[in-house]
Design a protein with these regions (language model features):
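Glycine-rich phosphate/pyrophosphate-binding beta-alpha loops
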Residues: 95-126
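C-terminal and late-domain segments of enzyme folds
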Residues: 33-96, 100
Length: 188
């Protein structure tokens, strides 16, 4: 049908997973970037949608690691594709992103990305849209934004005083940090 569909059912969830991140060493830069951007979008979007839900604390832990690993290692791996440590970090981050969507659903950026896949890859389309939804959702997701903004500040993507901001101003600061991350990775 040409339509992407998400099927989640206990019958198709394996009892164990095997991860061999070494297989990514030969992956082209575009595939590496798109996979990492999609994985970080999973974590970011589920984190936003988890506010007030029973699994929020668990999602916060998952998102903290997934987002930090992608923001820290994607630019490095794109500069040095043979960086095994970076590839392992990105593999773990995207696996955490996959785990995130088992906890809760994605939202605006993923939904909008499907309208853009004729001109952009899915991961890049999500990365393009996430800053906009970050600002849009900001008043309702201040806790997640402080988490993401803190990671961005720690990694040098923003100099804003994240803890002093709230509402739209916080959303704008985090959105600008997300854009700075994409730019540092050399992606449009």
């Amino acid at each position: 049908s040409g339509q992407k569909k998400l099927i989640v059912d206990e019958a198709i969830v394996p009892p164990r997973a095997v991860f061999d991140y070494a297989v990514t060493l030969g992956a082209p830069a575009s595939l590496t970037a798109d996979g990492a951007l999609d994985g970080v979008s999973h974590s970011l979007e589920v984190l936003y949608s988890a506010v007030g839900k029973p699994f929020y604390a668990q999602m916060e832990r998952v998102a903290r690691e997934s987002i930090r690993l992608v923001m820290q290692y994607l630019p490095k791996v794109l500069e040095d594709p043979a960086d095994g440590t970076g590839r392992e970090a990105l593999g773990l981050a995207t696996d955490l992103g996959a785990y995130a969507i088992m906890l809760g659903g994605t939202n605006g950026a993923h939904l909008t990305s499907f309208s853009l896949i004729d001109i952009l890859s899915h991961g890049r389309a999500c990365a393009l849209m996430n800053p906009y939804y970050t600002v849009f959702f900001a008043p309702a997701v201040e806790g997640p934004l402080k988490l993401v903004g803190g990671i961005a500040r720690e990694l040098g993507y923003t100099h804003s005083d994240i803890d002093a901001l709230g509402g739209r101003a916080l959303g704008l600061a985090v959105a600008e940090a997300l854009i700075a991350f994409i730019e540092r990775a050399g992606l449009p």
